[in-house]
Amino acid sequence: MRLWSWLAAVVQYMNGRERCATMSSGYRCGVPEPSPGQANLLRVLNIARSTLPVVMSFLLASSFASAQNGAPAPRPSDEFSFMQLLADKGLHDIENESWNAYGQFTYISSWKPSFSAPYTNLNGSINSLLPTAERSFTGTATLYVGVRLWKGAEGYLVPELISEQPFSQLRGLGGAIQNFELQKGGTSVPQIYHSRIFVKQTVGLGGKSLVEESGPLQLGTHYDSRRLVFVAGNFSILDFFDTNAFDVDPRDGFLGLGFLTYGAYDFASDARGYSYGGVGEFFWDDWAVRVGRITPPKDPNQLPVDFRLFKYYGDQIELEHKHKIREQEGMVRALAFRNRENMGRFSDAIAAFEADAKENATTCTGFNYGSQNAGAPDLCWARKPNVKKGIGVFAEQYIGHDLGVFGRAMYADGQTEVYAYTSDDRSATVGLLAKGSSWSRPKDVAGIGGNLGWISSIHAKYLGMGGVDGFVGDGAITAAAEKSLDLFYSAHFRGVYWLTGDYQHITNPGFNAARGPVNVFTVRIHGQF
């Protein structure tokens, strides 16, 4: 814990110094001076930040130059693993583990230049993406610890540290938010928390014996192709639902929020994306079905959790089938969700305002987003137990050696406010990913993808009247699909590191054709151990 505090102090000093950069040099804004050891680390970090664009350009040039090399692509060798090192020395059974530990760190820095917008935060509405140039960053460090509890049972603990600065206080974008690591309500002051504490029990039912390799959130083991799995505790529902080989983790692939899962999948979770609850999975060879019930936040997009799982909850069910087409692996899934939460319907908020103009965005004393538009309806006046439903489909398919395509689409009812994920009511995503075997860099990854998000007609009417939801609301709207293009190249180097350059082009930010387009340029450094 002393090490975490020491690192947190370094990050706090860096962020505090940046905030004070525009002030006279005689002020420190209350930021304490670093210790000699912290000062040395700061020098290294500053050198790294100043040289990162040059290094990235060199690596990318080397990667594409290697593509011209006609040498056969080698298979990727294993990166450094502490668990593998112990196994090599006879100190650990990595195939049937009693425990393991892994870690990761990721730093993501984004910049958007100024863009065109005829209005911003019109009439006191507050959820516009600011048209001025902005910088954003996230820094995370995570430790994954797993232990064998008894036969078939595993326990996991995952502490995490995060520091962040979003564009425009994380306002003005739907599913096109450029960095999934961003959390609602996060700050540049480093925060340490546990992201997961859960138990998993597996019951074998026969079939083929399969090997599960050691990794984060997975002990190395053997299990039956036909089995039952039960999970209980604190986790992300995306640890089990809508997982896939291509784009599940923004730390390795696409950075955009809409590529993590269905943009319209308003899965119940706190502001960090985690929940409490249970999941049950049934595997039968190439088929799987899973169900889960998890906790929502007490208020939309906030951190405190409502543990009344029989009153407010998020339910989901997913059916999965794995297949091969011409010996190329693929997968299809269908997912449905049903949430019961204390949330407002757009039509009820509009009706309340039209019946009494005093029930506007500035007068409600319950939970609200702080809009200053006295001429607009507000969801605060409409919150009561309501249900949100949606259904989606997903498919992924290898179409060649280390080349794959994927797509997903979801339709949600669009009658109630966003409670945890994005403002999308309908969403669709397609993408193409390639590993670098063809140009002799087998651990490099390149990808291009497109993401679309729509809102319902009643949602658009509410925003057009000046209302805001958890993420969007310019004060007026020319309703249109929010579109984003994401292009990235991730270069692997020195065994455990990846350096990524990413470009995103966002059209109709906040579902508003009157504003934008927006360009976002991002550099990411990621290490895993």
Predicted regions, residues:
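Residues on the lipid-exposed face of transmembrane beta-strands in outer-membrane beta-barrel proteins
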Residues: 103, 141-147, 197-201, 232, ...
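Short loop/turn motifs that connect adjacent beta-strands in outer-membrane beta-barrel proteins
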Residues: 89-101, 112-114, 146-155, 204-227, ...
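Transmembrane beta-barrel strands of outer-membrane/channel proteins
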Residues: 105-109, 157-161, 230-234, 291-295, ...
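N-terminal periplasmic/intermembrane-space "pro-region" immediately following the signal or transit peptide
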Residues: 58, 64-133, 144, 148-150, ...
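Outer-membrane beta-barrel "beta-signal"
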Residues: 71-72, 195-208, 517-529
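Residues that define the transmembrane beta-barrel architecture of outer-membrane proteins
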Residues: 97, 135-141, 190-195, 272-276, ...
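Outer membrane beta-barrel transmembrane domains
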Residues: 318-320, 335-385, 406-408, 413, ...
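Surface-exposed coil loops of outer-membrane beta-barrel proteins
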Residues: 172-189, 193, 208-318, 467-477
